[in-house]
């Protein structure tokens, strides 16, 4: 009977866990819909920003301005890389499957790849899980911040990027990339690696559409071309991080929704298995009692 009581307790415990995971799945589904909408709107803004970049660069090319002095821009084919800053984004919480692990693996892979080429790598971390991992393993993270990946905020992203941009402009680093787990669809995510600094010259040659550029930019902005590009580039870099945070949050909710759905289904299966075990144990107990009663009756004859 003690065995039956143990099984009953296990069934009750698993059912309670099932209720929790199911509730977490519903919460993640609701949050995912909101995050997906924000990501969609933010992507539209990012594309508009890219279009403005293209217009300005095309206009400069049409005017015969090929030599861009802005430090934000480099000719990628001739760029010599000696130092790289990697900004990684992970979640502040767990229970989201391989979401954080996959990002960390990619960061380690990129770090090793650069080191094999004798390129110095510095890490900048956003998200408690990633920062904890590297701290536990004795890997230095230059700048770290928590509670930003779970609550993306443009002002905080802007502040975080300020130091990164300063290091780039002062020559402390030659390249800045962002690594995060991005939202692909409701049931899948993908690791994304994006170079945000420097911005390559090749953008000029990808958009030879002078008429469209002239139609889009109808007035002459004040300041030199490089000043205009610096202002746009600064906004582009800041928004690149902000969009990555939004994209990562949507992917996190997607991963957690899947993880909780899997956990709920596993709990259902375990309840079925335990119920079968309980019924078998109960049947065995009844059979044993009947055998003992019959044996007692026979002994009294």
From Swiss-Prot:
One of its GO terms (biological process) is proton motive force-driven plasma membrane ATP synthesis. InterPro entries: ATP_synth_F1_ATPase_gsu, ATP_synth_F1_gsu. CDD domains: F1-ATPase_gamma. One of its GO terms (cellular component) is plasma membrane. It is a peripheral membrane protein. It holds the Pfam family ATP-synt. Keywords: ATP synthesis, Cell inner membrane, Cell membrane, CF(1), Hydrogen ion transport, Ion transport, Membrane, Transport. Transmembrane segments: none annotated. The keyword Chaperone does not apply. It is found in: Cell inner membrane. GO terms for molecular function: ATP binding; proton-transporting ATP synthase activity, rotational mechanism. Its main location: membrane. The keyword Cell inner membrane applies. It comes from the Bacteria. Produces ATP from ADP in the presence of a proton gradient across the membrane. The gamma chain is believed to be important in regulating ATPase activity and the flow of protons through the CF(0) complex. F-type ATPases have 2 components, CF(1) - the catalytic core - and CF(0) - the membrane proton channel. CF(1) has five subunits: alpha(3), beta(3), gamma(1), delta(1), epsilon(1). CF(0) has three main subunits: a, b and c. HAMAP family: ATP_synth_gamma_bact. Belongs to the ATPase gamma chain family. PANTHER family: ATP SYNTHASE GAMMA CHAIN (PTHR11693), ATP SYNTHASE SUBUNIT GAMMA, MITOCHONDRIAL (PTHR11693:SF22). This is ATP synthase gamma chain. It comes from Helicobacter pylori (strain HPAG1). The gene is atpG.
């Amino acid at each position: 009977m003690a065995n039956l009581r143990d099984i009953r307790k296990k069934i009750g415990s698993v059912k309670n866990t099932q209720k929790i995971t199911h509730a977490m799945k519903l919460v993640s589904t609701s949050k995912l819909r909101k995050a997906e909408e924000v990501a969609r709107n933010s992507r539209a803004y990012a594309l508009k920003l890219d279009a403005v970049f293209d217009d300005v660069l095309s206009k400069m090319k049409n005017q015969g301005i090929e030599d861009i002095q802005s430090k934000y821009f480099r000719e990628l084919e001739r760029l010599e890389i000696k130092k790289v800053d990697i900004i990684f984004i992970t979640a502040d919480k767990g229970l989201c499957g391989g979401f954080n692990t996959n990002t960390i693996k990619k960061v380690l892979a990129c770090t090793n790849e650069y080191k094999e080429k004798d390129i110095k790598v510095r890490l900048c971390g956003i998200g408690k899980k990633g920062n904890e991992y590297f701290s536990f393993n004795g890997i230095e993270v230059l700048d770290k911040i928590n509670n930003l990946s779970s609550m993306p905020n443009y002002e905080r992203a802007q502040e975080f990027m300020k130091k990164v941009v300063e290091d780039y402009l002062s020559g402390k680093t030659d390249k800045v990339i962002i690594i995060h787990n991005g939202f692909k669809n409701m049931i899948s995510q993908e690791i994304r690696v994006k170079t945000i600094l420097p911005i390559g010259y090749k953008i000029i040659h990808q958009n030879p559409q002078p008429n469209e550029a002239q139609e889009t930019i109808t007035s002459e902005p004040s300041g030199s071309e490089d000043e205009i590009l610096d202002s746009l580039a600064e906004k582009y870099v800041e928004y690149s991080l902000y969009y990555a945070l939004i994209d990562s949050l949507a992917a996190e909710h997607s991963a957690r929704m899947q993880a909780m759905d899997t956990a709920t289904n596993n709990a259902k299966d375990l309840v079925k298995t335990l119920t079968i075990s309980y019924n078998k144990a109960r049947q065995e107990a009844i059979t044993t009692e009947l055998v003992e009663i019959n044996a007692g009756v026979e002994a009294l004859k």
